Amino acid sequence: MKPWLKIFLFCIAACALIGFDRIIKNFAKEHLMDGQIISYFKNFFVLKYAENTGAFFSLGNELSDSVSLWIFIIVPIAFLISLLMYVIVKSKEMNWIKLLGFALILAGGMGNIIDRILYDRHVTDFMILGIHNLRTGIFNFADLFVSFVVVSLLLFYRGKKDENLKVSENQPTE
């Protein structure tokens, strides 16, 4: 596939994912902002509206506005611009799985940055998973996009490490 087509498809995927994130967050604002809690599968999946000014598990909620601006908006934007430049430069060598992974990271990051810019530095969160008292923190699809890629990379590279160990174990020693 031609590099320009890969970049085009990457941009389409990232924009579609950002659009999906925006639509679902707006739906959560419209239907859950009044304090309504919706539960599915015996409380395994819960929808509950929250505004998070911090990061994962609300880390950084108490930061000053200026520090928050740098940590949650400016630095992530710089990272995402670097990521986009990397994809543009390396797209020729990338397969579609890597491109989709980078599109998920870009969409997840941009989804939350858009929230922070539009809604006075807070992100709309609305999903919780768990059984009984063992529950996740509250999150959104942008968080899920990035988390999916991180977990996939960890599993992929763990598998590669295991393969390398097997290959080196089968090599004759000198």
Which residue ranges define each predicted feature?
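Alpha-helical transmembrane bundles and membrane-interface segments of multipass inner-membrane proteins
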Residues: 1-174
